[in-house]
Amino acid sequence: MMARRDPKSWAKRLVRAQTLQKQRRAPVGPRAPPPDEEDPRLKCKNCGAFGHTARSTRCPMKCWKAALVPATLGKKEGKENLKPWKPRVEANPGPLNKDKGEKEERPRQQDPQRKALLHMFSGKPPEKPLPNGKGSTESSDHLRVASGPMPVHTTSKRPRVDPVLADRSAAEMSGRGSVLASLSPLRKASLSSSSSLGPKERQTGAAADMPQPAVRHQGREPLLVVKPTHSSPEGGCREVPQAASKTHGLLQAARPQAQDKRPAVTSQPCPPAATHSLGLGSNLSFGPGAKRPAQAPIQACLNFPKKPRLGPFQIPESAIQGGELGAPENLQPPPAATELGPSTSPQMGRRTPAQVPSVDRQPPHSTPCLPTAQACTMSHHSAASHDGAQPLRVLFRRLENGRWSSSLLAAPSFHSPEKPGTFLAQSPHVSEKSEAPCVRVPPSVLYEDLQVSSSSEDSDSDLE
């Protein structure tokens, strides 16, 4: 019977029996881990404890029910300072305690020295310390109070202005008030465009048989005041800005050929006035004509380069070209009266941008009034100068109020069959006198006027 048993089945039964025995021996609670699992070098990622890994059944995170709640150990009274003691006073302090005591005594000794110095500088008698300890705070009150006057802070700051420029600007603004009030918008636009160029030249005289244009302005026109002086009879000399301030005219005199390259303004000429009654020492006044031509375009250069200052001996050519709309470049009168027709309009229509109208604004000057005069012969490059006609001459006079006046010195050889009353209102009164000997103005006077006028021109641009 025993031989019939299979040995394999016997072995299987033995293994089963051993496993059952092991299961019976296992405790009901958590099984203690084998010694190989308790390695202090291992750390659990779940609970963060050392000695096991996250796979181990010993981890309390996996078998939380079997984990023991940590119990508190007993209280230790020595840890908490429930009854603080008083600071101990040692009889023999150490070296560190001695340094602390010396530092506390030093500021106490320096306090009376500081008080004595403060009383010396402030000049106040020493105050007795109060028993309640308020003396220390009251003794330093004089440091907070300033002994000198307190500074006054003002928000409005006035700019520093040169007194000379202030006087000039006040006089200019008072003179411009009535003129600017009556200007039309078109006139104000032309005035603002020409203000950067300084006071322009005025037309002081023209040939009797030469046409002069006029422009109709919309609205009111400013009145130009003419003040008669003792140097010109019958009030025939019109006020002209100082010749020294005409730097643009000096530039034109230095470069007469550059005028042909500038843009031109075309206008129809008015009927000329007759000069057959003129002679040596005769006076002529111009007035408005019976007809006015159409409005001519006005060209104003807003940005001009800086004009170089030339010598004081050169008389500006634009002194006779600075009228209300400028005078023509060709001032040489034709020899015959038949050339005054439509053939002269191309020559008279050429104008330069510098001859823009501007209001008569002249700052006051403190230079002495010298009744000097200077005659200048104007050179022309026109075709009419080859016909044997005499050139025009301009006489500049210095008035009493520091201004300059100019008058034409024309020969009596020019005649015209036109009536003398047709050209009476085209320009203010201009006197035309006979040729006189050339009296030279001292160069220093002209150069001084040039410097004064340039400074006034800069002040005008700053004010506007």
Swiss-Prot record:
Residues 74-89, 97-114 have a biased composition (Basic and acidic residues). Disulfide bonds: none annotated. It comes from the Eukaryota. InterPro entries: FAM90, Znf-CCHC_6. It holds the Pfam family zf-CCHC_6. Residues 1-42, 70-389, 411-437 are annotated as: Disordered. Transmembrane segments: none annotated. Residues 180-197 have a biased composition (Low complexity). Belongs to the FAM90 family. This is Protein FAM90A9. It comes from Homo sapiens (Human).
